[in-house]
Every structure is written in C-alpha cells, then in structure tokens.
C-alpha cells in the first residue's frame, strides 16, 4: 500500500463524510451551526483518524488506537444521524443509517 487512499475503509469513510456534509446542508437553518456542525465534524473525524493511524502504522499500538478512535467517531455520527432522522424529514438520512 502506497497511501491511505488505497484503504477501502478510508474510501468508505471519505464517501460517508461527503454524503453527510451534503445532507447536513438540508437541515433547518437554525440547526446548521448546532446539529449540522456536529455531524459534519464527527463524520470527517472518522476518515481523519484512519489517516492519522495510517501515518503511525509503523507503531502497531498507535495504528490500532486511531482505528478505535475512528470507530468511536462512526458511532457518534450514527447517533447524530438517528437524532436527525427522528427530528426532521430528510430522505437521505435513511440511506446513511
């Protein structure tokens, strides 16, 4: 592997972050800086932690630690998506959870 971009998990996380970002822009205006900001940050954190872990892959414990962080960010993102799904009628949310 030459780059983190060769990792399937990174590409999946990157695509999720893009979809979540676009979906978040459909939230009511008053939520763009609250719920919208939080879900954008948590979705981007997934891919960022994968990249940081890849950068430390020489140290197995560090690599694993950042993958655990990525998983935790994924769970946070899913929780945010479930909340948005309950509160608002945005059809793209159902496709993400």
Regions found by a protein language model. Give the residues of each.
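Amphipathic alpha-helical assembly/interaction segments
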Residues: 1-97
